Amino acid sequence: KAFGLTIHNTISIKNSIEDDIIIEEKTTIEDMNKSDWNKWMAKNNIFDWDGLVYLEKAFKNNTDQFNNWDFFYYTIKDKKGKILLMTFGTYGIWKDDMLATESVSKQLEEIRKTNPLHLTSKVISLGCLFTEGKHFYVNQEEELAERAVKLLLDKLEEKYNDLKADMLVLRDFEEKNTWDKVIQEQGYFKINMPESCVYNAEKWQSYDDFSKVLSPRSRKHFNKEIIP
């Protein structure tokens, strides 16, 4: 599931920070504590610290505006410094037909040959277009968990207004999750996302191990195009 929201009002993040919780924002994974990040986020897809370093190198400072993103990272803690929530997101250009049928996209791609920004939007999103899966960690056992989620939503809304984005997207949530009601009460609506594939990597622990289970053709592509 993803949540989308079009917002027109302005909110000050100062009004969302309370005495017993605080939110920290960074613009690169290299400014995040590696051990803390990996403790809570590493098990979710390619979201470990080194994986985000790779994504930043691949999708920052590019001449192609569709592959040039701004990254941001949030950590919310209680007054004792205990982590309540961690997440990351990106700001970039999305094609409006990403969830449309193939025939619709083909027609639009023909138009984009001469008008690249045709039917595109500036989007703030949890995660990025390269990733799938749970893009945030919340310590649900803490009493302050719900307030931490609401503070995150306030901060994202402020960023949405500051950047004059067209859309704010929270993704990817399980169909039934703890924060459904909280998020929808903030004005978001649900959008069904395409099915994804999860590969259980129990049989390999390294790139070399993984390449051994590939076909000769796939192994050649992996070694030449992916590993570098």
Q: Language-model segments: which ranges?
A:
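N-acyltransferase acceptor-side catalytic subdomain
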Residues: K1-P228
